[in-house]
Amino acid sequence: AGVVDVFKEAGLRIFGPSKAAATIEASKDFAKQLMAKYDVPTAAFETFEDYEAALEYVRKGSIPVVLKYDGLAAGKGVVIPETFEEADEALKDMLLDDKFGKGKVVVEEFLTGPEFSFMCFVDGTEVYPMTLSQDHKRAYEGDKGPNTGGMGAYSPVPIITDEDVDYAMEKIMKPVAAAMVAEGCPFTGVLYGGLMKTPSGVKVIEFNCRFGDPETEVVLPRLASDIYDIFSAVADHTPMPEVEWRREVTMGFVMASKGYPGSYEKGFEIKGLDRLPEDIRVFHMGTSVKDGKYHTSGGRVLMVVGFGSDLQEAHDKALAAVESIECDNLFYRRDIGWRVL
């Protein structure tokens, strides 16, 4: 049983999905089969356990292609090979060498278009939308380099229209919530839709059963309502109070250890956090305190969030704060928000 199941058995209130409902994130194959069954728009796909069969399928299709390890892989289980050789290498890793454990691989078509994150509070068939955000997955500026857990984010996302959001609600988030109920594993908690606006409409890239990181750091500061009331309504299955959002917009930069998402060193001192302006929010992702001083202790170390009346102002404030933080082993992307600035 998962932690939510254990709490419920003990008669305790808890916000979050059951272990069964969390399968929507824990298994890519489960999520894809669910979408196929309930006609939720997503990339065409096929699931394989056999290396030869997967390789043959990739050979017949077009490159680039998307390869997803079926289970949880700490955000590293998705590969987008640009050549057939790279695809072969990745399939060997996943299916022959069991790099992430024994499992299956979902092979899906490569979609193009801007991605955005649509998080919703869900209680069975009731779906309450949060404001949109956009993450920046690649390690380096210009969207270059390997995929990471996310190097920055902003909210809202002007390039996504109200029509896009309505479509995502009516054709994706609500139907998926209803599908989970129909499948006997109703979802409660935060359902995160990783969506893409393709030339043929909004489609699902992935689902997570939790708040997204780094998106949450730019979304929740914009929440005007008391989050406790929201959690309570979902946990108790009672009507949700109206969820209100601030007009101020947000943008945040992640400061990561040099070498991330590969191997990196830890233990570098971070200076200047006590000198930042009042209206800058700093989220500690991978820091430790030793003798009253902050040190790096993870891959993604800090996220620095700025506020503004528009995204340019939020960007400039956050970037100025980032540039004033001193540490010998951190890097960051200066181009967070490039699609909208």
What positions do the PLM features span?
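A short, GP-enriched loop/loop-strand-helix hinge that lies immediately N-terminal to
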Residues: 1-26, 40-49
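General beta-strand structural signal in soluble alpha/beta enzymes
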Residues: 14-17, 44-47, 65-69, 80, ...
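Short, charged, surface-exposed secondary-structure boundary motifs
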Residues: 23-29, 140-142
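Conserved anion/nucleotide-ligand pocket segment
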Residues: 62-84, 219
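Generic C-terminus detector
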Residues: 287-291, 296-341
